[in-house]
């Protein structure tokens, strides 16, 4: 009996050892290169794929599969697992992209307050005016050098949208709520006002709320119809009502109405205002970076103009960006409205009026009878 048990034990041990070996398929880069794979990323991808998804196969079986993929990689591009290897093997002929030259002379543009504008901004506007799609432009007195189009620069284009001319923080804006509160109350209740400012928004890059705030912008169809936006919806939900960093702020102050015929129909007098400045948070930044890269790949420009790469509005990428940009703009507005609504509720007041205006955007307008995109 003892002898039989020993034999049984040995057999079980051998069987377990065999299973253990089979469960830990190990392939080396040398083996993979030996069957014809060239040195490069494909070797490590093949090694990882086989050892992860084919761990119950023998080395010979795994190598045979790799040989078959190597022989006809195009047959495996739709395979859920082996496509990772096949994609590294298939040589895709890249569409030839030729650099687009700038026009020798630029379109005319207005300069307001030229003596106040730095040289870098003037040079950038000269470059932008030479774009083949440029129609007209303008420089504001406070214009200064930016990326591509100067900050404070305006550019109208023909059926083309320039993601970087719109900007990274799409739809960034200022929003003002006016309350029927005597300005003296700001000093008397300073601690209270300060507490509610900090409690009802979040400052700092990447900040997110843990609780959900409902808003119709989060249910927009663009989040499901544009593949790139799908994974951004959750972050947009978490960042709704946050303020970000940099020059973004939320602050109370004094508002003085002096015009009897003001458009808000408010009596002349002094009020407390809540002013905010922020944009579309991570949603807008991701949209800007993604479509800027696409534009730079499709529209290759000279080095000094590369950030002015555009997307034609009659292309899929151009139409997608237009929809995504408008979504980001509406999201930025929703962020401000959320901040103002939370703070108004916290201080027990309802605003008499609200004013907001945005930048970092593009609009469809008419210029001398021509349809243009104004950045």
Question: Model-found features: residue ranges?
Answer:
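Short, low-complexity, charge-dense intrinsically disordered segments
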Residues: 2-16
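Charged substrate- and nucleic-acid-binding regions of tRNA-handling and nucleotidyl-transfer enzymes
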Residues: 22-89
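Polybasic, low-complexity association/targeting segments
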Residues: 74-114, 341, 346-350
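An N-terminal structural lobe/cap that precedes and organizes the functional/catalytic core
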Residues: 105-108, 124-168, 176
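Domain-length cofactor-binding catalytic modules of enzymes
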Residues: 107, 117-120, 132-135, 148-151, ...
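Short, glycine/acidic-enriched loop or turn micro-motifs at the edges of active sites
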Residues: 144, 172, 280
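Metal-associated gating/positioning segment near the N- to mid-region
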Residues: 175-187, 192
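Acidic, glycine-rich loop-and-strand cores that form catalytic or ligand-binding grooves
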Residues: 209-220
């Amino acid at each position: 009996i003892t002898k039989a048990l020993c034999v049984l034990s040995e057999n079980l041990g051998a069987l377990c050892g065999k299973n253990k070996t089979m469960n830990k398929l190990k392939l080396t880069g040398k083996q993979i290169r030996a069957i014809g794979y060239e040195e490069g990323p494909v070797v490590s991808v093949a090694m990882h794929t086989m050892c992860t998804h084919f761990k119950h196969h023998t080395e010979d079986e795994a190598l045979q599969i790799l040989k078959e993929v190597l022989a006809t990689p195009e047959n495996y591009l739709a395979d859920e697992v082996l496509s990772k290897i096949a994609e590294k093997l298939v040589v895709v002929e890249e569409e030839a992209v030729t650099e687009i030259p700038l026009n020798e002379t630029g379109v005319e543009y207005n300069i307001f307050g030229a003596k106040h504008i730095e040289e870098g901004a003037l040079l950038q506007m000269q470059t932008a005016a030479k774009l083949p799609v440029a129609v007209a432009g303008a420089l504001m007195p406070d214009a200064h050098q930016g990326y591509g189009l100067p900050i404070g620069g305006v550019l109208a284009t023909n059926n083309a949208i320039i993601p970087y001319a719109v900007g990274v923080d799409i739809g960034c804006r200022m929003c003002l709520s006016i309350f029927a509160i005597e300005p003296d109350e700001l000093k008397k209740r300073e601690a209270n006002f300060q507490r509610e400012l900090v409690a009802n928004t979040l400052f700092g890059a990447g900040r997110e709320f843990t609780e959900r705030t409902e808003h119709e912008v989060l249910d927009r169809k663009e989040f499901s119809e544009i593949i790139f936006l799908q994974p951004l919806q959750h972050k947009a939900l978490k960042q709704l009502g946050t303020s970000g960093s940099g020059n973004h702020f939320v602050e109370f102050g004094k508002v003085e109405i002096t015009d009897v015929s003001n458009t808000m129909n408010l009596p002349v007098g002094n009020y407390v205002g809540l002013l905010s400045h922020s944009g579309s948070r991570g949603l807008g930044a991701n949209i800007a970076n993604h479509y800027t890269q696409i534009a730079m790949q499709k529209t290759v420009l000279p080095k000094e103009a590369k950030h002015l790469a555009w997307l034609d509005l009659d292309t899929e990428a151009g139409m997608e960006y237009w929809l995504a940009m408008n979504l980001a703009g509406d999201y930025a507005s929703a962020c401000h409205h959320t901040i103002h609504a939370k703070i108004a509720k916290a201080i027990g007041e309802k605003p008499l009026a609200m004013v907001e205006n945005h930048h970092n955007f593009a609009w469809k307008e008419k210029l001398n009878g021509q349809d243009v995109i104004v950045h």
